[in-house]
């Protein structure tokens, strides 16, 4: 009998006989797959009680190596496959079985691409698979961080809902609505987006305890994050009644603009959906699906329930008892669960049990001070802010990229950091944090029972630790929570000493990292930024909506940057100074912060430009004589006058704000504030105008101008808006797929007239030309994947990759 190549290579260490070799291999692999096959004797699926450890991501080369390994396994003879059930271990830690074992354990094998494509009946799943089977295929050597893991070869099934839908617990259902009865201590899990209404009993959702009321809560449950668990806490006659209703916010439309938004929501009906839709029809679709286990998902994604550590629950209970006196700072290493804990605590504080006997309900809301510019909760990256929340939040950050609703919450004040990490300018970061804390104290005058939650970034080592200890000692906190029991000691000891000096309680909790991350931090930032520019919330509408048009198709604001009636009074850069001759090129296509200068004190005044003492006294006396009606105009003129002394004019007449040669001093937070972000589409030197795309409400801009504020644009070092460049390409691809589906459907139905085929071919030709033009934009390259696995799965697909615009001494384009 011929030996395999792998057997020949390890012959020296192998047993003597073939029987002994087979027995040794089986004993060696038995412990490796013990957790996977423990329950195969009784069930066809492997159900795990707790989430496994975080798995490493595989690159494209590893995926190709795995596919080659699978092909070698398939070529083994039937005789050897029948004698042995060999388990071959791949580098990424996943387990690949031979053909016989995979046929017996169909629940944990990888679905074939064509089989998965045929199982998806909804357009989202179909479009996602046609575009990219893995969500976003990783391009080798990507430097911008936009890579995502390939599909795992093994999917471990997890229990999600603790109830199974049947005729006894389904109160009523139709094509849009499902009302279920949940017994106490049991729970249900859904994927998608829906409106939740508690009719009877009390249920808990992401830390919030929702009591019966006419209020409806919007819940977003995508596959990128652990799914919310709706659990019955107390009920009427031992059960609670909850109604779930489909909602059409438009956020699913973003799948046509970016592959990052594909395979996020429900796709096709699950077994529980088919049961509840039996009376309506199997063709009906809701915007949510009920899942009993992760195996019910038609797309076979890594779905996990959102569990809460017992120590977390105890800490939240203790902190919430402080009510309005609570001022807590949450810190810890990266990926330790700070955002999840803060969201749970926020929702718990916003949903206390009503006390009618005391005639008291929480109407003061909760203040949320977000000091993490890399992964903020309610604004895009690069900002720190103070938000005032009135309602619990059920969804990841890209489902609420801004707050413009008085009922749900508003942004009190924000400052532009211009980077994803505060280490770029820690002094400016500390000043911004102190100013936001002053705004919170001002808020207490109106809402005296408003607690405060401070979210500190994962910058907890080195200089970041010094900043954290300074904030603990200076902000007047009541509690500090550190999210790691593993230390390290060099971090815990300084935090403990700072808390002791400030007489602040320090609580150390275990970290709870996210399992099976399907999007990287850079991808989540890109998704939140894209959602920010596409979200709209008209006046009088309780929930936001998302628009599907690419930002390049939106009509921009045309603003003058020179002349008497200019809308922008200056442009400044952070972190590093840009040569004036290159300022125009660096601004086109860049993300900038729209900052309002409230007084001249925000500007750095060089000593050479300081006015003489007698002039200051005359100005002071003149200020006393100014009427209140003219005070706003006087303040505006003074600010513009100081801006003039700091600006230099470029060859395009752009007002470039500098505080000296080679220096770039940010605006002082006490006299400036951030209004929002804008995307500069183009600069026209002939008309001296800027074309800006921004979601900032026009009412907010008008209000700032009426107060006499001067608007400036601040360019930082944020991630390049590659998503904006690629939106037209993906929109064209999505339109082509829709047209092809329509043509295929008409042919199958036998509907059509003579001459329709020529019209269809002309239409497809126009769409192909649109795709070609969108693909040929600057800094965008289509990379063809000629991997063996991709050739077998489908025809060669075009994968795009964006290249950053390289500046002087830049290596961003090296290797492409």
From Swiss-Prot:
The family assignment reads: Belongs to the Clp1 family. NOL9/GRC3 subfamily.
Q: Which PANTHER family does UniProt cross-reference here? A: CLEAVAGE/POLYADENYLATION FACTOR IA SUBUNIT CLP1P (PTHR12755), POLYNUCLEOTIDE 5'-HYDROXYL-KINASE NOL9 (PTHR12755:SF3)
Residues involved in ATP binding: 332-339
Here the segments flagged for biased composition (Low complexity) are 11-37
- Could you tell me which Pfam families the record lists for this protein? CLP1_P
* GO terms assigned for molecular function: ATP binding; polynucleotide 5'-hydroxyl-kinase activity
What does the record give as EC number?
Answer: 2.7.1.-
**Residue stretches in coiled coil:** none
Which keywords annotate this record?
ATP-binding, Kinase, Nucleotide-binding, Nucleus, rRNA processing, Transferase
Designated name of the protein: Polynucleotide 5'-hydroxyl-kinase grc3
Q: Where in the cell is it found?
A: Nucleus, Nucleolus
According to the record, the residues making up region (Disordered) are 1-132, 603-626
Principal location class: nucleus
């Amino acid at each position: 009998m011929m030996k395999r190549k792998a057997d020949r290579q390890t012959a020296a260490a192998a047993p003597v006989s073939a029987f002994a070799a087979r027995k040794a291999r089986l004993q060696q692999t038995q412990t490796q797959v013990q957790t996977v096959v423990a329950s195969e004797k009784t069930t066809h699926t492997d159900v795990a009680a707790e989430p496994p450890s975080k798995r490493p991501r595989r690159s494209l080369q590893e995926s190709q190596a795995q596919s080659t390994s699978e092909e070698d396994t398939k070529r083994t003879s039937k005789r050897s496959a029948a004698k042995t059930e060999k388990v071959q271990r791949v580098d990424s830690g996943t387990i690949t079985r031979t053909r016989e074992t995979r046929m017996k354990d169909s629940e944990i094998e990888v679905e074939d691409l064509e089989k998965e494509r045929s199982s998806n009946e909804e357009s989202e799943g179909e479009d996602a698979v046609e575009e990219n089977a893995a969500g976003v295929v990783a391009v080798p050597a990507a430097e911008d961080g936009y890579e995502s893991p390939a599909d795992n070869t093994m999917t471990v099934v997890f229990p999600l809902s603790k109830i199974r839908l049947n005729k006894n617990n389904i109160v009523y259902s139709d094509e849009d609505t499902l009302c279920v009865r949940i017994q106490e201590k049991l729970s249900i899990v859904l994927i998608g987006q829906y409106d939740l209404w508690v009719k009877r009993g009390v249920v808990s959702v992401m830390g919030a305890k929702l009591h019966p009321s006419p209020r409806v809560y919007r819940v977003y449950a995508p596959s990128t994050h652990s799914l919310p668990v709706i659990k019955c806490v107390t009920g009427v006659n031992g059960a609670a009644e909850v109604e779930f209703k489909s909602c059409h916010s438009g956020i699913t439309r973003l799948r046509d603009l970016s592959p990052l938004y594909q395979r996020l929501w429900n796709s096709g009906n699950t077994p529980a959906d088919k049961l509840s839709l039996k009376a309506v029809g199997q063709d009906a679709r809701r915007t949510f699906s009920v899942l009993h286990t992760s195996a019910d998902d038609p797309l076979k994604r890594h779905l996990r329930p959102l569990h809460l550590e017992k120590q977390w629950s105890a800490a939240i209970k203790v902190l919430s008892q402080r009510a309005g006196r609570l001022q807590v700072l949450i810190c810890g290493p990266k990926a330790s669960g700070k955002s999840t804990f803060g969201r749970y605590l926020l929702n718990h504080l916003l949903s206390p049990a009503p006390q009618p006997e005391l005639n008291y309900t929480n109407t003061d809301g909760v203040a949320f001070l977000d000091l993490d510019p890399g992964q903020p909760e309610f604004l895009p990256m690069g900002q720190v802010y103070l938000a005032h929340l009135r309602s619990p939040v059920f969804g990841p950050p890209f489902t609420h990229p801004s707050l413009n609703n008085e009922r749900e919450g508003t942004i009190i004040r924000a400052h532009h950091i211009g980077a994803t990490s505060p280490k770029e300018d820690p002094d400016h970061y500390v000043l911004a944090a102190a100013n936001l804390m002053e705004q919170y104290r001002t808020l207490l005058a109106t809402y005296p029972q408003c607690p405060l939650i401070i979210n500190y970034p994962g910058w907890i080592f080195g200089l970041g630790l010094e900043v954290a200890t300074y904030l603990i000692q200076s902000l007047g906190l009541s509690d500090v929570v550190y999210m790691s029991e593993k230390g390290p000691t060099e971090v815990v000891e300084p935090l403990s000493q700072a808390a002791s000096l400030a007489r602040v309680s320090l609580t150390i909790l275990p970290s709870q990292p996210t399992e099976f991350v399907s999007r990287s931090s850079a991808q989540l930032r890109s998704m939140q930024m894209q959602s920010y520019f596409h979200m709209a919330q008209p006046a009088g509408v309780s929930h936001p909506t998302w628009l599907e048009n690419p930002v390049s198709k939106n009509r921009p604001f045309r603003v003058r940057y020179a002349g008497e009636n200019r809308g922008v009074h200056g442009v400044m850069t952070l972190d590093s100074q840009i040569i004036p001759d290159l300022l125009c090129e660096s601004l086109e296509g860049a993300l900038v912060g729209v900052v309002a200068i409230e007084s001249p004190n925000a500007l750095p005044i060089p000593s050479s430009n300081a006015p003489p003492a007698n002039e200051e006294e005359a100005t002071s006396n003149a200020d006393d004589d100014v009427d209140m009606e003219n005070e706003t105009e006087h303040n505006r003129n003074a600010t513009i006058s100081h801006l003039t002394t700091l600006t230099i004019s470029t060859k395009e007449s752009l007002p470039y704000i500098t505080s000296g040669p080679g220096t770039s001093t940010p605006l002082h937070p006490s006299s400036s504030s951030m209004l929002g972000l804008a995307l500069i589409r183009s600069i026209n030197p002939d008309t001296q105008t800027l074309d800006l795309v921004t979601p900032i409400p026009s009412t907010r801009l008008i209000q700032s101008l009426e107060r006499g504020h001067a608007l400036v644009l601040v360019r930082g070092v944020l991630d390049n808006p590659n998503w904006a460049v690629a939106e037209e390409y993906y929109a064209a691809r999505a339109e082509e797929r829709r047209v092809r589906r329509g043509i295929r459907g008409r042919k199958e139905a036998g509907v059509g007239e003579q001459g329709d085929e020529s019209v269809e071919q002309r239409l497809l030709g126009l769409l192909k030309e649109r795709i070609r033009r969108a693909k040929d934009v600057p800094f965008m390259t289509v990379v063809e994947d000629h991997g063996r696995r991709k050739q077998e799965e489908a025809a060669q697909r075009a994968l795009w990759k964006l290249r950053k615009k390289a500046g002087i001494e830049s290596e961003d384009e090296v290797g492409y």
